[in-house]
UniProtKB/Swiss-Prot annotation:
Functional description taken from the UniProt entry: Involved in cell wall synthesis where it is required for glycosylation. Involved in cell cycle progression through cell-size checkpoint.
Disulfide bonds: none
Family annotation (Pfam families): GMPPB_C, NTP_transferase
GO CC term, one of those recorded: cytoplasm
Family under the similarity heading: Belongs to the transferase hexapeptide repeat family.
InterPro entries xref list: GMPPB_C, GMPPB_N, Hexapep_transf_CS, Mannose-1P_guanyltransferase, NTP_transferase_dom, Nucleotide-diphossugar_trans
Protein name, entry field: Mannose-1-phosphate guanyltransferase
Originating species: Cryptococcus neoformans var. neoformans serotype D (strain JEC21 / ATCC MYA-565) (Filobasidiella neoformans)
Reaction(s) catalysed by this chain's protein: alpha-D-mannose 1-phosphate + GTP + H(+) = GDP-alpha-D-mannose + diphosphate
Sorted UniProt keywords: Cell cycle, Cytoplasm, GTP-binding, Nucleotide-binding, Nucleotidyltransferase, Transferase
A Gene Ontology molecular function term of the record: mannose-1-phosphate guanylyltransferase (GTP) activity
């Protein structure tokens, strides 16, 4: 099988992290976001993966070369000279996606879930229609586009954008399977798969919905990145995953859902958790309190500091007796001096902060 991952452009929603790395290479729970998806696709038998990119493809090529060799797959880079939306990239990659009669996956690179690609593939093959959309249930469907199926059927009847009245609670999860025939519907121009292609396939009664079981989150912006981290860690806990740090062996773990890279240095008087990820070679000092946060590789949190609901970027340093909270995001190589309060700041790379930031703002 084949797959196309919609990588897209500048990743502006996840700045300042994406000022240093393309969004798919930003670590989500200590692994590049795109590697979570590639590994799951390989398990479903995918051999050819197309990455539709229009920002810094050369960085991704060098990083993912090892991934190709490790999994014995072919990773193709389809580079857009202009943004082509969510459907145009399929036309651009027609030569690979349409090279045989087998169906292909399409997925948004921002989505994290359990990735049930094998079950999704089997569902698609069984109904013998042109396309399948993975859907997930949400509590507030009025904020999304809702997928409405025919009664007692998986056949999609229509799509309702941000409904005022309740018509259903299933939304597009950003993961699809198509037969190559769908390529005949798509021109090589900026095109929306959601607004232009899906309604046409649904009108022909050739589009089905597949219910995603378990968690789902679009992690393309900081608050959702943190929420998705919590969901993913909770999933690992439910699976008794060895990727999580064992509280019985590490007394500084509090409340569970903690993932710490083995190379990180944690002072035994620190209190970490719940819902914390600490990356490679990070250093956590005495008396530090971490909760619902991500500390990326080579970052340092000095003595008696408190970090909650925030992301500390690569190579950054948080000084002693400092409080960081409220969706603060520190870019690469940021320094926060001692005894400061940082509230909801987005700090661009290589900045040094020497005064408190009491209200959310961007520090350039």
């Amino acid at each position: 099988m084949k797959a196309l991952i919609l990588v897209g452009g500048f990743g502006t929603r996840l700045r300042p992290l994406t000022l240093s790395w393309p969004k798919p290479l930003v670590e989500f729970c200590n692994k590049a976001m795109i590697l979570h998806q590639i590994e799951a696709l390989v398990k479903a038998g995918v051999k050819d993966i197309v990455l539709a990119v229009n920002y810094r493809p050369e960085v991704m090529v060098s990083v993912l070369k090892k991934t190709e060799e490790e999994f014995g797959i072919n990773i193709h880079f389809s580079v857009e000279t202009e943004p082509l939306g969510t459907a145009g990239p399929l036309a651009l990659a027609r030569e690979i996606l349409g090279k045989d009669d087998s169906p292909f996956f399409v997925l948004n690179s921002d989505v994290t879930c359990v990735y049930p690609f094998e079950a999704f593939r089997d569902f698609h093959i069984a109904h013998k229609c042109e396309g399948s959309i993975m859907v997930t249930k949400v509590a507030e469907p009025s904020a999304y586009g809702v997928v409405v199926t025919k009664p007692n059927s998986t056949v999609i009847d229509r799509f309702v954008e941000k409904p005022v009245e309740f018509v259903g609670n299933r939304i597009n999860a950003g993961i699809y399977i198509f037969n190559p025939s769908v390529l005949d519907r798509i021109e090589l121009r900026p095109t929306s798969i959601e607004k232009e292609i899906f309604p046409a396939i649904a009108a022909d009664q050739q589009l089905h919905s597949f219910d995603l079981q378990g968690f789902w989150m679009d992690v393309g912006q900081p608050k959702d990145f943190l929420a998705g981290t919590c969901l993913y860690l909770s999933h690992l806990t439910s699976q008794h995953s060895p990727l999580l740090t064992d509280p019985s062996q590490n007394k500084w773990v509090y409340g569970g859902n903690v993932m710490v890279d083995p190379s990180a240095e944690i002072d035994p008087t620190a209190v970490i958790g719940p819902n914390v990820v600490i990356g490679p070679d990070a250093k956590i000092g005495p008396g530090v309190r971490l909760q619902r946060c991500v500390i990326m590789s080579n970052a340092t949190v000095r003595d008696h500091s408190w970090i909650a609901n925030s992301i500390v970027g690569w190579n950054s340093t948080v000084g002693r007796w400092t409080r960081v909270e409220n969706i603060t995001v520190l870019g690469d190589d940021v320094t926060i001096k001692d005894e400061l309060y940082v509230n909801g700041a987005s700090v661009l790379p290589h900045k040094s902060i020497s005064t408190s930031i009491t209200e959310p703002r961007i520090v350039m």
